[in-house]
């Protein structure tokens, strides 16, 4: 029997094993902090139960926490007579939420105090707070440079070689997303279409779509702020469409350029005479190896204003140049990278690609300087250590806290 504490990490099947790879990164950092790690597979309930029982026997009262991504496993037991599994076992469950709460909304609002949600950007956290109004804990933890346990390295581009610029992104024809809208009631079609018009009228960059949905609904006389079902339906539909539309714009701009695009769903594009290569998606561990060989990685943010996608953090973590779309947060925090950034109206992505191609050496120098700065400021490893601190606080106040004064006891009733 071990006298060490253990952390459970919950995983399952995801596209290209992205969550599986992130879970291995969590485990790497947690082990350096002195905790053992046990993996649970939510897709195999028999294996899940056996490993959990064995772990509880091996670590009696020393399972420090369970961690998952995207709400995996947070709802286990919610609808059973015994109640939520983590509450029953007194194991704090922390889930790192990567998507807008409008997607899989139940994963963002658990009925049990054992579950705590961690958001990597404030936009999603604030939507959760303002509209889902969760009864239990949430927190904000930004990622930081993702080194994947490797040392970042400065690129040394050769003048005789075309620099490797990649765009790892799956897409789909945005027009096909609008087809099902045609059978909806005319009022819903109006709100969907006017939300899109409002979004492009208000922003040329990222930005949440919820304000555009509200503006379109208000103009139609429909109040959505107290109608979470309709509100999140519109947000999910518009958010998905806008993101796919942006991928389409980027991919079309890249076709004449010497870029490698890794992803599914772009076979509808006419690649006749294209210089860009559209390649099949690869598993995440292979993608990390490609990151190490690249001079620049093209990214596209989610529709957010106050953080970036994890892809620029991967670029900075390996020492190469992130080429991403601009939002106010990016503009404020990465002014030296603005010449290599783009939006969807005035700053064409082809200009950023051309800048990399015209002067790879300067690109490499700027990327390396920014990589060093980011790795000193914040990394994914630092985020995981902060996560462990949050878990200890969450565990204490959920399962161990005894109010020292009568006033606090009354507040807790």
Residue ranges and their predicted role:
Residues 87, 105-120, 130-133:
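A conserved, positively charged/aromatic
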Residues 57-75:
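Short N-terminal targeting/anchoring amphipathic segment
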Residues 13-18, 44-45, 71-76, 100-101, ...:
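Short acidic, S/G/P-rich loop/turn micro-motifs used as interaction or catalytic elements
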Residues 86-99, 116-120, 143:
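Active-site proximal beta-strand in glycosyltransferases
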Residues 1-15:
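Nucleotide-activated donor-dependent transferases that construct or modify glycoconjugates
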Residues 8-11, 21-33, 37-45, 110-111, ...:
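Catalytic binding pocket for nucleotide-activated donors in carbohydrate/polymer assembly enzymes
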Residues 11-22, 134-305, 326-330:
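Nucleotide-sugar donor-binding catalytic core of glycosyltransferases
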